[in-house]
Swiss-Prot record:
InterPro entries: Anti-sigma-K/W_factor, Anti_sigma_zinc_sf, Znf_put. Residues 1-86 are cytoplasmic. It is a single-pass membrane protein. Its main location: membrane. One of its GO terms (molecular function) is metal ion binding. The keyword Isomerase does not apply. It comes from Geobacillus kaustophilus (strain HTA426). This is Anti-sigma-W factor RsiW.
Length: 203
């Protein structure tokens, strides 16, 4: 004989504590007459009692620490990979900076040909740019792989890369005079130049 499904639902309600008194009476009457349902009810009762007992069992205080010690240690490469995935913008900026600094440092080692940015009112002799006495050069002068001797006036900045500057007592420069002979000075100069060019293109 198959028991109706409502008896199983009554059992569940009983263990949940939601069973009304009339439902409890109906369940008890059925359990007296059906041995299979009584056995099932008894098994459920044992299971509920076991779960209630197990809920009060606590792990030893050092259990979590011992489990963490027993776990395999995380490799440094996994930690680095996780950091790179969590911070993509920082990773991209760092990579860009490293490549930029690397290219600037490598271009420092490549000593190119002599060049000068101004050719009016100057004399060029054996990789030396001379601003003659009584002459005024308007604008900035950049000398690469050579030297500059200022006897006149420069109305702007003077930058010497891989070279020397010589100032006569009568020579004047209205702007800054900068000698770049080290790699870090070269990198800083290029960063400033690129930044100034970017600002000029925005304007």
């Amino acid at each position: 004989m198959e028991c109706p499904k409502e008896i199983v639902l009554l059992m569940h309600s009983y263990f949940d504590g939601d069973l009304q008194p009339e439902g409890e009476q109906q369940l008890k009457e059925h359990l007296r007459s059906c041995a299979a349902c009584a056995a099932h009810f008894h098994e459920l009762k044992k299971t509920v009692a076991f779960l209630q007992y197990a809920a009060h069992v606590a792990a030893p205080p050092s259990f979590a620490a011992k489990v963490m010690e027993a776990m395999p240690k995380e490799r440094k490469t996994a930690r680095l990979r996780r950091f790179l995935h969590r911070h993509p913008l920082l990773t991209a900026a760092s990579l860009f900076l490293a490549l930029t600094l690397g290219s600037l440092a490598s271009s420092w080692g490549e000593r190119g040909a002599f060049s000068v940015s101004a050719d009016e009112h100057v004399i060029i002799r054996d990789h030396t740019v001379i601003v003659p006495k009584g002459e005024t050069v308007k604008g900035d002068i950049v000398v690469r792989n050579g030297s500059i001797r200022i006897e006149g006036t420069v109305d702007g900045d003077v930058t010497v890369i891989h070279g020397k500057k010589y100032m006569a007592s009568a020579g004047q420069v209205t702007g800054e005079v900068e000698e770049i002979n080290q790699v870090f000075e070269w990198i800083w100069y290029n960063i400033k130049e690129r930044f100034n060019r970017a600002l000029q293109s925005i304007e």
